[in-house]
Amino acid sequence: MRDLKTYLSVAPVVSTLWFGALAGLLIEINRFFPDALIFPFFSF
């Protein structure tokens, strides 16, 4: 059980969560602003 906890606390799980969150964020941005090269909330 200790080995399992050690494995779950290292890079594969952290990177999977990070890339999953990043992919979700990019999907949501592209859902609200499809094919946007310039985002409206950055222009002044």
Swiss-Prot record:
Recorded topology in the membrane: Single-pass membrane protein
UniProt name for this protein: Photosystem I reaction center subunit IX
Chief site of localization: plastid
Subcellular location: Plastid, Chloroplast thylakoid membrane
Pfam family, one: PSI_PsaJ
Family: Belongs to the PsaJ family.
Domain of life: Eukaryota
Alphabetized UniProt keyword annotations: Chloroplast, Membrane, Photosynthesis, Photosystem I, Plastid, Thylakoid, Transmembrane, Transmembrane helix
Organism of provenance: Phaseolus vulgaris (Kidney bean)
Gene3D superfamilies the record matches: Single helix bin
InterPro entries in the cross-refs: PSI_PsaJ (IPR002615), PSI_PsaJ_sf (IPR036062)
GO biological process, one term: photosynthesis
Residues annotated as transmembrane: 7-27
Gene Ontology CC: one annotated term: photosystem I
Protein function: May help in the organization of the PsaE and PsaF subunits.
